Amino acid sequence: MPVTTYPRCKKLFGIAVWWSQLTDDWDEVKEIHDLIYPQIKKHLTDATFYASDIVTINGPSRWIGPHVDTPHRFEQYNNRENNDICGVQVIIPLDDLDKDTGATGVVPNSHREDWNIQDCYEGVHDEYFLENAEQYDMPKGSILFYNTRLMHSTMPLNLPKKRSILLINYLRCDIIEDIKDKDNMWSSNGK
């Protein structure tokens, strides 16, 4: 059988990323929600639990994919004129994370810009991201939360090991139903 080479696929060298099905109904996730929700409400008073999942990267991996999170993946919610906080994303590492183990990179103050999600998916902002991203050491069980408009990404995982994180997404309660109508993750997860 002949083998076809696609130059754009070379960017995927070393990629090994798994997203779980939604973990919303897990007892552990409910317990974590109960612990962190008071802090989330300090920043988004009408915060409502939207979704949670686990992302695992298998190293070594050079993959990055800078992006913004739900709801800003959808054009209606991705403009700075509506400068309200629409959502808060929570990352809880299930392994110790640092620069060698793929700690999430964030670009400070990037929530002040509009980021076209298709450009993000196509790698238009990769170079900008790598030049401006900051990474934080995050021991297992620590918490990083940020405005869902903030540009962020998994960073290269230089070691031959895995790294897993629990993600929890909170949204303003008045946009949840609209987002569920737009978001294809619900159809792929049986909701």
What do these predicted ranges mean?
Residues V3, C120, I143, L150-K191:
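Non-heme Fe(II)/2-oxoglutarate
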Residues H67-E75, D119-N132, D181-W186:
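Short, surface-exposed loop/helix-turn segments at secondary-structure junctions
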Residues D84-G87, L97-M155, I175:
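Double-stranded beta-helix
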Residues Y77-I85:
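Short, glycine/small-residue-enriched coil/turn segments at secondary-structure junctions
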Residues T56, V68-T70, I92-D96, V106-P108, ...:
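Short, structured patches in soluble enzyme cores that scaffold and shape functional sites
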Residues Q39-T48, N83-D84, L94-D100:
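Secondary-structure boundary elements
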Residues M1-N78:
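Non-heme Fe(II)-dependent double-stranded beta-helix
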